[in-house]
Amino acid sequence: MAPAVATWAPGLWRACNALMAAFFALAAVVQVNDPDAELWVVVYMIPAVLTLLVGFNPLVTGNFIWKSVSAIHMLFCALWAGGLAYHFLLHAKQNLLNEEEGRELSGLVIVTAWMALCHSSSKNPGGGRMHLAIAVVITLLPLLSWVYVHMNKEMRSSWPTHCKTVI
């Protein structure tokens, strides 16, 4: 007999998707005064919309168009993250979150990880326990990172001007 899906699991999956959609939308909004804002707004708005759709209807991850857009976006973000990681390894002077490229790399990794998690949920839209545990960790990661960065005055002092004037 197959184990029954916990009654709270679909609600938790939807809540994680709602929080991640809000995070991605906020990440897009704070790019407004970045020198390459148009690129980063697209990078964050695509997963914001795709994630919002999953929050409304978890079965959308089985849709061909949703799967295609998410797969292409994941590939693009993974390749870009690889290039940034290589650059960061060669030129890093400080902690990952102190460097703009490090924060960009973190954003791309979060986008790729979340989209991969959503992409894999098409077989079990409610999510299994491990799937939900990973979802909760990924959902908390950006929130905790932003709190850490915004509370750390030393880190904020090294930011470029366009990062200091957004929020």
UniProtKB/Swiss-Prot annotation:
Keywords: Membrane, Transmembrane, Transmembrane helix
InterPro entries hit by this protein: TMEM220
Cellular-component GO terms for this entry: membrane
Subcellular location(s) of the protein: Membrane
Topology within the bilayer: Multi-pass membrane protein
Entry superkingdom: Eukaryota
This protein's record includes keyword Transferase: no
TM spans (from-to): 10-30, 40-60, 69-89, 104-122, 130-150
Keyword Membrane: yes
Stored PANTHER family: TRANSMEMBRANE PROTEIN 220
UniProt name for this protein: Transmembrane protein 220
